[in-house]
């Protein structure tokens, strides 16, 4: 399993991961383009919102490679909720009402899929006071944990099952093989 720092994966990264026999990458941020002061940018605006097996020469299209891209769950609210914001399934980047919107949107949009994935991301340092800009105090960490608890309870209420990225690869491979 691989996740590029600062979501900086590009076609070269994907080709290298395939060559090194990685099974899962989770570096893509749908609907986002990351600008760099150096002039180079990482553009994941074309990334699918749901997992797919990466095509080495066209990283936003499916292929029969063994590298599964599991993009972070980010929705473009301008298309669905009429306000200009990218909503992340990530603590400190969204509130519980936005998480509900994300879940409802993904479940509705992908209801015909064999499986649906919601991919939440956070750094372990965010659970340590003053180790992250998002949690500067124990009170911040406590609020963070309360938020995570609300998300997990909401997921449970919505019958969402938890899985590791490796387990998602196994599920995706099973459906890919069954549909050949």
Residues of each region from the PLM?
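Extended hydrophobic secondary-structure segments that form protein cores and membrane-embedded regions
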Residues: 1-4, 121-122
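C-terminal domain-boundary segment and adjacent tail
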Residues: 88-180
């Amino acid at each position: 399993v691989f996740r590029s720092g600062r979501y900086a994966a590009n076609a070269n990264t994907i080709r290298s991961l395939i060559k090194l026999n990685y099974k899962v990458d989770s570096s893509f941020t749908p609907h986002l383009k990351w600008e760099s002061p150096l002039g180079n940018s990482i553009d994941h605006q074309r990334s699918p919102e749901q997992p797919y097996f990466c095509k080495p020469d066209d990283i936003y299209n499916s292929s029969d490679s063994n590298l599964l891209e599991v993009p972070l769950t980010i929705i473009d609210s301008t298309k669905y909720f009429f306000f200009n914001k990218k909503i992340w399934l990530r603590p400190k980047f969204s509130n519980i009402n936005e998480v509900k919107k994300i879940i409802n949107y993904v479940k509705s949009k992908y209801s015909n899929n064999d499986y649906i994935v919601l991919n939440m991301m956070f750094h372990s340092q965010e659970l340590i006071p003053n180790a992250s800009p998002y949690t500067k105090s124990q009170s911040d960490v406590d609020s963070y944990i309360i938020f995570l608890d609300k998300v997990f309870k909401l997921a449970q209420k919505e019958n969402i099952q938890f899985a590791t990225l490796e387990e998602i690869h196994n599920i995706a491979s099973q459906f890919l093989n069954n549909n050949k």
